[in-house]
Amino acid sequence: MKVAKIVFWIAGIWGVLVLTPLYFLFDVIGRQDPPAITHPGFYYGFISVRLAWQVAFLVIARDPVRFRLMMIPAVVEKFGYGASLLVLYLQHRLHPSDLVFGGVDVLFGVLFLLAFFRTSA
Protein backbone atom coordinates (compact mmCIF):
# COMPACT_ATOMS: atom_id res chain seq x y z
CA MET A 1 0.00 0.00 0.00
CA LYS A 2 2.89 2.36 0.75
CA VAL A 3 4.21 1.94 -2.80
CA ALA A 4 0.81 2.89 -4.22
CA LYS A 5 0.57 5.99 -2.04
CA ILE A 6 4.01 7.21 -3.09
CA VAL A 7 3.54 6.43 -6.79
CA PHE A 8 0.14 8.09 -7.05
CA TRP A 9 1.20 11.15 -5.03
CA ILE A 10 4.23 11.66 -7.26
CA ALA A 11 2.19 11.13 -10.44
CA GLY A 12 -0.54 13.53 -9.33
CA ILE A 13 1.83 16.28 -8.26
CA TRP A 14 4.02 15.84 -11.36
CA GLY A 15 0.96 16.06 -13.60
CA VAL A 16 -0.39 19.20 -11.95
CA LEU A 17 3.02 20.89 -12.19
CA VAL A 18 3.51 19.96 -15.85
CA LEU A 19 -0.04 20.52 -17.10
CA THR A 20 -1.15 23.71 -15.33
CA PRO A 21 1.29 26.01 -17.20
CA LEU A 22 -0.12 24.75 -20.51
CA TYR A 23 -3.24 26.85 -19.86
CA PHE A 24 -1.04 29.93 -20.36
CA LEU A 25 1.15 28.69 -23.22
CA PHE A 26 -1.37 28.34 -26.04
CA ASP A 27 0.20 30.98 -28.31
CA VAL A 28 3.79 30.16 -27.32
CA ILE A 29 3.36 26.53 -28.36
CA GLY A 30 2.04 27.62 -31.75
CA ARG A 31 5.07 29.83 -32.32
CA GLN A 32 7.75 27.45 -31.02
CA ASP A 33 6.32 24.22 -32.43
CA PRO A 34 4.42 25.11 -35.63
CA PRO A 35 1.85 24.82 -36.96
CA ALA A 36 -0.28 26.91 -34.66
CA ILE A 37 -2.98 25.14 -32.67
CA THR A 38 -6.18 25.54 -34.69
CA HIS A 39 -8.70 23.94 -32.32
CA PRO A 40 -8.45 25.62 -28.92
CA GLY A 41 -11.40 23.61 -27.62
CA PHE A 42 -9.48 20.37 -28.12
CA TYR A 43 -6.33 21.90 -26.62
CA TYR A 44 -7.97 23.20 -23.45
CA GLY A 45 -10.24 20.17 -23.23
CA PHE A 46 -7.19 17.88 -23.34
CA ILE A 47 -5.52 19.81 -20.53
CA SER A 48 -8.71 19.82 -18.44
CA VAL A 49 -9.26 16.07 -18.79
CA ARG A 50 -5.62 15.39 -17.96
CA LEU A 51 -5.83 17.62 -14.88
CA ALA A 52 -8.97 15.79 -13.77
CA TRP A 53 -6.95 12.58 -13.88
CA GLN A 54 -4.24 14.16 -11.74
CA VAL A 55 -6.90 14.86 -9.12
CA ALA A 56 -8.00 11.21 -9.39
CA PHE A 57 -4.39 10.11 -8.81
CA LEU A 58 -4.23 12.24 -5.66
CA VAL A 59 -7.52 10.73 -4.46
CA ILE A 60 -6.17 7.22 -5.07
CA ALA A 61 -3.02 8.15 -3.14
CA ARG A 62 -5.11 9.04 -0.07
CA ASP A 63 -6.59 5.53 0.19
CA PRO A 64 -5.14 3.04 -2.33
CA VAL A 65 -7.01 0.05 -0.91
CA ARG A 66 -10.39 1.75 -1.20
CA PHE A 67 -9.69 3.10 -4.69
CA ARG A 68 -7.73 0.10 -5.99
CA LEU A 69 -10.11 -0.52 -8.90
CA MET A 70 -9.59 3.09 -10.07
CA MET A 71 -5.98 2.11 -10.70
CA ILE A 72 -7.13 0.13 -13.76
CA PRO A 73 -8.45 3.15 -15.73
CA ALA A 74 -5.42 5.09 -14.46
CA VAL A 75 -3.17 2.52 -16.17
CA VAL A 76 -5.26 2.80 -19.35
CA GLU A 77 -4.91 6.59 -19.25
CA LYS A 78 -1.13 6.39 -18.97
CA PHE A 79 -0.57 3.67 -21.57
CA GLY A 80 -3.15 5.19 -23.91
CA TYR A 81 -1.31 8.49 -24.13
CA GLY A 82 2.07 6.81 -24.54
CA ALA A 83 0.74 4.50 -27.26
CA SER A 84 -0.89 7.41 -29.09
CA LEU A 85 2.37 9.33 -29.20
CA LEU A 86 4.28 6.26 -30.35
CA VAL A 87 1.86 5.70 -33.25
CA LEU A 88 2.12 9.37 -34.25
CA TYR A 89 5.91 9.15 -34.15
CA LEU A 90 5.94 6.00 -36.29
CA GLN A 91 3.75 7.84 -38.82
CA HIS A 92 6.30 10.70 -38.85
CA ARG A 93 3.68 13.06 -37.41
CA LEU A 94 5.48 13.75 -34.13
CA HIS A 95 8.91 15.15 -33.31
CA PRO A 96 11.12 12.68 -31.39
CA SER A 97 11.51 15.14 -28.50
CA ASP A 98 7.75 14.94 -27.89
CA LEU A 99 8.15 11.26 -27.00
CA VAL A 100 9.72 12.26 -23.66
CA PHE A 101 6.36 13.06 -22.08
CA GLY A 102 4.87 9.87 -23.49
CA GLY A 103 7.78 7.97 -21.94
CA VAL A 104 7.07 9.52 -18.56
CA ASP A 105 3.44 8.43 -18.87
CA VAL A 106 4.43 4.87 -19.80
CA LEU A 107 6.77 4.78 -16.79
CA PHE A 108 3.93 5.90 -14.53
CA GLY A 109 1.70 3.28 -16.19
CA VAL A 110 4.18 0.55 -15.25
CA LEU A 111 4.40 1.93 -11.70
CA PHE A 112 0.59 2.04 -11.51
CA LEU A 113 0.47 -1.64 -12.50
CA LEU A 114 3.04 -2.41 -9.82
CA ALA A 115 0.98 -0.46 -7.28
CA PHE A 116 -2.19 -2.30 -8.34
CA PHE A 117 -0.64 -5.73 -7.81
CA ARG A 118 1.09 -4.73 -4.57
CA THR A 119 -2.11 -3.32 -3.05
CA SER A 120 -4.30 -5.91 -1.38
CA ALA A 121 -7.86 -6.21 -2.59
Name every feature range the model reports, one short phrase each.
Residues 1, 22-45:
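Interfacial loop at the N-terminal end of multi-pass membrane proteins
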Residues 1-14:
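Cytosolic juxtamembrane helix and N-cap/initiation of the first transmembrane helix
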Residues 13-21, 38-62, 73-79:
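Core segments of alpha-helical transmembrane spans in multipass integral membrane proteins
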Residues 19-22, 57-61, 85-89, 112-116:
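Structural signal for membrane-spanning alpha-helices in multi-pass inner-membrane proteins
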Residues 32-42, 69, 73, 93-104:
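Non-cytosolic membrane-interface motifs at loop->transmembrane helix junctions
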Residues 62-68:
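Membrane-helix interface "capping/anchor" motifs
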Residues 82-100, 117:
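Membrane-helix boundary connector in multi-pass membrane proteins
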Residues 107-121:
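Membrane-water interface at the C-terminal end of transmembrane alpha helices
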